Amino acid sequence: MRSVFLAGVALVSALAAQPATAAPDLDLRDNYAHRRCHGGENAGEGLTVGVPGQEAKAIAASQGRVKRSGKVLTLGKVRLKTRMVDGDGDGGEEFEYLGGWARSGLEVVFVLRYEDLAWRLIDPRSGQSIEMGGPPLASPSGKAIAAVGDDSLINEFNGIEIVDYKDGRFESQAIDADYACDPVWLSDEVLQLKVLSPKYRDRNGELLAGELPPSAWRTTKVVRKNGEWTLVAPKP
């Protein structure tokens, strides 16, 4: 009996010594599924926000890093208090915690305002934050975060935005791109995506009449050169 008891104690001790399972890194790639390059008419339908119970699951997976008490969302040094969005100019903001990236220690909160929305990147250790106009996607190391837009959301975000997180600071760079879609990180230095072919605009920059087929988009890349992000010109 003693040997069996000791074996049981050893097993319990071994299980207790195992580290807690880390929460999976936030992955918002499916938020781009309803964009113009896929023939989508309402990009908002593809956003994974406002789903009942979703935030509670994300907070539970944070293993104590993030907490909510009523209208107050706490992420380390950062406290966000919801003010219901009732109308234009009321200053209302609603916050929903989505998850984070263990690789960089950054957290992501969705922000809803009157006729506006954003994704806020937060460093809960320093309290610093920055907002992006589209669903953020982290590079393999988690130190570069990209978002692209095709002017299909209420914030009218159109183009590419890349945020570098270095030495505890956020550095943002905006890149002109027409109806950007389908971002995929190939490495920490290369972001693949699709942009609208220039032949679908006239000399004045206006869109040609008619619907845009999925074939109107061209696959290209954004690459980092000498510390700057540059869009490789797409083929016509």
Task: Spell out what each predicted region is.
Residues 1-8:
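Bacterial N-terminal signal peptides that target proteins for export
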Residues 12-19:
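N-terminal signal peptide c-region/cleavage motif recognized by signal peptidases
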Residues 21-112:
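Terminal domain-start segments
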Residues 58, 67, 98-105, 135-147, ...:
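Blade-terminus and WD-like Trp-Asp/Gly-His loop motifs, strongest in beta-propeller folds
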Residues 69-88, 114-131, 158-173, 205-233:
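Surface-exposed loop/turn elements that mediate protein-protein interactions on large endomembrane-trafficking
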Residues 109-114, 147-154, 158-159, 193-199:
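Beta-strand C-termini and the immediately following turn/loop, strongest in propeller blades
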Residues 119-157:
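Mid-length scaffold segments of soluble, non-membrane domains
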Residues 174-182:
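Conserved blade-ending motifs and adjacent loop-strand segments that build the rim/top face
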